[in-house]
Amino acid sequence: LPSVKDVYVTMLPGGDYKETADKSGDLVKKGFNPVPHFPARSINSESELKEYVLRCKDLGVKQVLVIGGSREPIGKFDSSYQILETGYFDGIKIGIAGHPEGSPDISDSDLEKAMIDKKPYADYIVTQWLLDPQPIIDFISKQSVPVHVGITGPLKISSLIKFANIVGAKNSINFLKSNFTKALDLLKPKDPNDLIGKVKSHTDYFHIYTFGGLKETNKWLKENNYV
């Protein structure tokens, strides 16, 4: 892992919360600050949620990221707000998800309402990753808590377009297609330095989505003296 403090531990749809908690505990022992995901729609029941939170606390976890997660709920929880209002996260630093470019799974109006509902519980917001700086700047200006801007590690343009389509980052898709149209451009790796330069006066925090490219991201972080 790169020489960073915070390491987010994902819980994919169908994943085992015990495994996510235990991996987080291992990271605590190695000196990291693990931030396990709590995807509401992937949690079976309130008792499972309580057990997941308590297990994380017992293992030394101090911070979590609460998200909606998969499209279809497997239990009683349909939104991140529903697990936030249980009160089980008291005493833990809470991050919530932000979507400056919208989401393919929810309308813009419902997304705005969800943010209003969640924000009283949030210590900070982690955004989806994106490439167009203006939606990020506009989003940050409306928030009352710190915003951790989602960026990618170095990736080929073709890969960025693929992942942008998956998360529904509309502005970023248009940004990529308008700036990188040649076939050779699509094969070149792109790092987020330009984006960081344009938004760093608006935030002190960045959240890196490596998409499996830990080595490349670690190299980029060191070459740019970010760690």
Report residues per predicted region.
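Membrane translocator/pore-forming domains, dominated by Gram-negative outer-membrane beta-barrels
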Residues: 114-116, 120-122, 126-137, 146
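Charge-patterned, long linear interaction tracts outside catalytic cores
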Residues: 204-216
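Catalytic cores of alpha/beta
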Residues: 46-55, 108-115, 119, 136-141, ...
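Active-site beta->alpha loop and helix N-cap motifs at the rims of alpha/beta catalytic domains
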Residues: 1-112, 116-117, 122-123, 181, ...
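Active-site pocket-lining/capping segments in soluble small-molecule metabolic enzymes
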Residues: 76-102, 144-195, 212-214, 222-226
